[in-house]
Amino acid sequence: MAELPLAAGLLDLRPCKLAPPPPPPLPVSPSPRHHRRPHSTATACRAAPDLHSSTELADGSIVFRFARPRDDDDEEQQQRRADAVAPEAAAVVESGLDGDAAAAAEPEARDGGGEGEVTATATGLDAEEVVASGGAEATATSGLEDAGEEASDGSTARDSDTDVDTESSASTAADDDQPAEFAVPPPPAEEVCNKVDWEKDTSEVKNTDRMVPVASSTLVLASGAAILPHPSKAATGGEDAYFIACDGWFGVADGVGQWSFEGINAGLYARELMDGCKKFIMENQGAADIKPEQVLSKAADEAHSPGSSTVLVAHFDGQFLNASNIGDSGFLVIRNGEVYQKSKPMVYGFNFPLQIEKGDNPLKLVQNYTIELEDGDVIVTASDGLFDNVYEQEVATMVSKSLQADLKPTEIAEHLAAKAQEVGRSAAGSTPFSDAALAVGYLGFSGGKLDDIAVVVSIVRKSEI
């Protein structure tokens, strides 16, 4: 049988006449990671021909007719290419590229066209750092997933917010091919800290543990006292009393002498008041919010001797002087050689002071004072034996001179008591007592008043703790 020429587009399937199959395409080896190829495109798969019809010839051979693939496939591939280009163009806009970079990226995406192409704009990285993996699965993954794979393999990524290179702990031999700017290791943490400290000049703040702490200061009292009885009462110790206790407590009391006409030692009641105050303070040492009037009230409850007395109880808490007074005993606060503050005598009339008697409630009689003190202030607390014979400004002058002579509080108190007794012995001259007598009509009275004298001098000083 004569051989018929094969029509164009027909395949000869006779024995030994089959056309040899086309050679298989060469396998495309996957490019190693971090290999720099600006355009890495996988070979597109060739579409298989469609069987159009078959015809049996007279010699028994069969002729098959094949046709090109349908246009639907071409349209589908074009659509897939368009879908791949769209997110790439959007990525270019989001990454903030300028006009020239965007124009360069768009043709690159169009030229790729293949299903296996991955571009730099898809992952937000530079083109040289992107590796094409080939196949449709590579394009199916999003740009975020590709970036996550690169970071997990120990690559270097750039943080767009902080513009700082962050490097994962894993490293491969391929990292050696990276540019020198990415291969520089980060500086040690110590160098970074030192640089920050130098720029912000915070070395002094961070080295506070090396600085010697400054000791805090507080104000305290240094107190001393002196007592001089009336010469006629020296055998019994006089009728005045005082106490000095810890933590800035002190006080004076002056027993009323009229009790002596009934054979009662007025000084006993005054001393019991002072002893009771000191005892209560010592028993409650360190307790907070103890007020002078509470101390006085407690001492008055425990006094058993008959009699009456004027009394003053005071406390310095480191800032304020708190004082409770009944009668004509009192205090002066001397600052810079002048009388800064003073108590006011509580009297019914001339030489007739208020007084507390056994069974009385001192809280109904007491007058309270609160005065803020400073370093260098001097408190002179005394019975009327001082204030009846020495003027207030004279007391301030004596205290100022004593401080210049560096005398101690006890020595200052002794000088004041001696001065008061000296003036009390005088029958001439003006005194606070003679002025008060003349003011109420005792004409021709002059000189001082000899009496018991109790003086407590307290100096406010700084104490380093």
Swiss-Prot record:
Cofactor note from UniProt? Binds 2 magnesium or manganese ions per subunit.
**Where is this chain compositionally biased, Pro residues type?**
18-30
Comp. bias (Low complexity): 84-106, 133-143
Q: Which reaction does it catalyse?
A: O-phospho-L-seryl-[protein] + H2O = L-seryl-[protein] + phosphate; O-phospho-L-threonyl-[protein] + H2O = L-threonyl-[protein] + phosphate
Lineage, top ranks: Eukaryota, Viridiplantae, Streptophyta, Embryophyta, Tracheophyta
Residues annotated as domain PPM-type phosphatase: 222-460
* Family membership: Belongs to the PP2C family.
Q: Which InterPro entries match?
A: PPM-type-like_dom_sf (IPR036457), PPM-type_phosphatase-like_dom (IPR001932), PPTC7 (IPR039123)
Please give the residue ranges the record annotates as the region Disordered.
Answer: 14-47, 68-119, 133-191
Q: What is this protein called?
A: Probable protein phosphatase 2C 71
- Which of this chain's residues are annotated to bind Mn(2+) 2? 254, 384, 451
Q: What class of enzyme is it?
A: hydrolase
List the PROSITE patterns hit by this protein, alphabetically: PPM_2
Write one Pfam family the protein is assigned to: PP2C_2
Q: What is its EC number?
A: 3.1.3.16
**Which cysteine pairs are covalently linked by disulfides here?**
none
Tell me which cofactor or cofactors this protein depends on. Answer: Mg(2+); Mn(2+)
Which GO molecular-function terms appear in the entry?
metal ion binding; protein serine/threonine phosphatase activity
Binding-site residues, Mn(2+) 1: 254-255
Q: Which UniProt keywords apply?
A: Hydrolase, Magnesium, Manganese, Metal-binding, Protein phosphatase
